[in-house]
Every structure is written in C-alpha cells, then in structure tokens.
Regions:
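A structural boundary/capping signal
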Residues: 1-135
Length: 135
C-alpha cells in the first residue's frame, strides 16, 4: 500500500516499506483523531491517523507537512520534495488531495486545534507503539 508520489531509490523505498509495516502494527483506536475513534477499525486502520503518523515520519526524515483543508488531511513533504502519505488509504474512492497549506511541526503540535485533537498525547502514544513495532 506504499503511496509514493515521486520516484526514489530502492533503499529508501525499502525503508518506507519497513515504516509502513510498523505503522500498520502501531495504529489503534487511541491514536486516531478523537471524533473518528468510534469509527476506527482494523478494516480501515489508517482512519484518523494522518497527523500523528506524519509526526512520526517527520521524526525520521524531517521536512514539512502538507495540509488539505477540504478533507482536513495532513501528510509529509520530505526534504527532497517527495510527498509521502502513509494514511491515504483511509479515503474511499478517487479522492483528490491538493496541498492547501504547508505547515511546520509547531503548527501541528501547538495551538487550539492541537489541544482539541489531543495531538501531542496521541502522537506520543503512536511513537511509543511504533518503537515497539521495531521500525
């Protein structure tokens, strides 16, 4: 289910496969966006995981974050300009995601919306589960 937006080296692709596998093992109801926790299931494990997943990926690769306002969706823009979205699969059908905003880490972890979404706690929980999963 690897979602690469531009070509990259085989070693980087392999690392992304490892990360994707660890993320899939790490996602859970508690790491999902609060209003989506009741709908979260193992059938759609990426549901509500975009922000915290993008933060974990940022821990390993750096870069910035892309945000689509229509779907309130966040994914990574790596330092080389490659866009990487490990949670794209949560959307059913042909959903077009355009970059409406470029964010930095502070934009995501601070502020009223981060507090309402309990972003820091969910991120720390996912980061802990991700470490245990072995990535």
């Amino acid at each position: 289910m690897l979602k690469l937006h531009t070509p990259m080296s085989i070693s980087q692709t392999e690392r992304f496969r490892e990360i994707e596998e660890a993320l899939r093992k790490s996602w859970c109801r508690e790491t999902a966006y609060p209003s989506l926790q009741a709908a979260w299931s193992e059938g759609n494990p990426a549901l509500g995981q975009c922000t915290v997943t993008a933060l974990v990926v940022h821990d390993h690769f750096g870069g910035t974050f892309a945000k689509n306002l229509e779907h309130n969706h966040i994914w990574n823009i790596l330092p080389d300009g490659t866009e990487q979205d490990f949670t794209r699969e949560q959307f059913v059908g042909d959903v077009k995601l355009i970059v409406d905003e470029i964010l930095n880490r502070a934009d995501i972890l601070e502020g009223e919306s981060a507090n309402r979404a309990d972003t820091k706690r969910r991120y720390e929980h996912l980061r802990w589960r991700f470490t245990i999963a072995g990535a």
